[in-house]
Swiss-Prot record:
GO terms for molecular function: lipoyl(octanoyl) transferase activity. Pfam families: LplA-B_cat (PF21948). The lineage of its organism: Bacteria, Pseudomonadati, Pseudomonadota, Betaproteobacteria, Burkholderiales. In the reaction, the free carboxyl group of octanoic acid is attached via an amide linkage to the epsilon-amino group of a specific lysine residue of lipoyl domains of lipoate-dependent enzymes. This is Octanoyltransferase. InterPro entries: aa-tRNA-synth_II/BPL/LPL (IPR045864), BPL_LPL_catalytic (IPR004143), Octanoyltransferase (IPR000544), Octanoyltransferase_CS (IPR020605). The gene is lipB. It comes from the Bacteria. Keywords: Acyltransferase, Cytoplasm, Transferase. Residues 30-210 form the BPL/LPL catalytic domain. One of its GO terms (cellular component) is cytoplasm. Substrate binds at R69, G70, G71, Q72, V73, T74, Y75, H76, A141, L142, G143, G154, L155, S156. GO terms for biological process: protein modification process. Disulfide bonds: none annotated.
């Protein structure tokens, strides 16, 4: 399958990337190759379409941007990889629920190969790691938008970041939800390494999905 993978400038402004995703999606045609954009954002809180302002508790000097993605509120910043997936789901023959599962399973697979056991949580999209006391902390978040069968936005995974800004919100709309990163799980790796691993895994899984459809499995 044809897939363009691009790294955006470090500290890319969320609003600029969002506008670029919308423009790409609006202009793409039936044969336009899918793309993956990888980046670390400058600090920003984003509110999804279902986002309630009361879940932004104390933004301090961090900007809050209302977005068209699904979900509630989250934080993006340095030390976190954001993977924007500009995929034609209609062309791939993929239902939204299967796409969400693909994103979650991609993060779980990459974390697993790094030695971190992660899991999905029923009713709460994203990827979680068990903490002492058997509580779950969120390590990866999802947010997607589908327009005319094409997806944009994607997933974020906390690599080695300052987690303090998550205390200024109810992450994903859940009061008291803990967050963690790969560094807190004892793993030292770069955002670039993790981003490339996620992109490679996404391409592999999307290709496998399309292959299973064409073979009638």
């Amino acid at each position: 399958m044809s897939m363009n993978v691009a790294w955006l400038s470090p500290g890319a402004a969320y609003a600029d990337v969002w506008e670029a995703m919308k423009a790409f999606t609006a202009s793409r045609g039936p044969a336009t190759p899918d793309e993956i954009w990888l980046c670390e954002h400058a600090p920003v809180y984003t509110l999804g379409q279902a986002g309630l302002p009361q879940h932004v508790l104390n933004p301090a000097d961090i900007a809050v941007v209302r977005s068209d993605r699904g979900g509630q509120v989250t934080y993006h910043g340095p030390g976190q990889i954001v993977v924007y997936c500009l995929f034609d789901l209609r062309r791939a023959g993929m239902y939204v629920r299967d796409y969400v599962a693909l994103l979650e399973e991609t993060a779980i697979a990459v974390l697993g190969r790094a030695g971190i056991v992660a899991q999905r949580k029923p009713g709460a999209p994203g990827v979680y790691v068990e903490q002492p006391g058997q509580t779950l902390a969120k390590i990866a978040a999802l947010g997607i938008k589908i327009r005319k069968g094409c997806a944009y936005h994607g997933l974020s995974l906390n690599v080695a970041m300052d987690l303090t800004p998550f205390h200024g919100i109810n992450p994903c709309g859940y009061e008291g939800l803990q967050t963690t990163d790969m560094a807190s799980c004892g793993l030292s790796c770069s955002v670039h390494e993790v981003g490339q691993a996620l992109a490679d895994e996404l391409v592999r899984r999307l290709s496998a999905y399309q292959g299973s459809l064409s073979s009638g499995e």
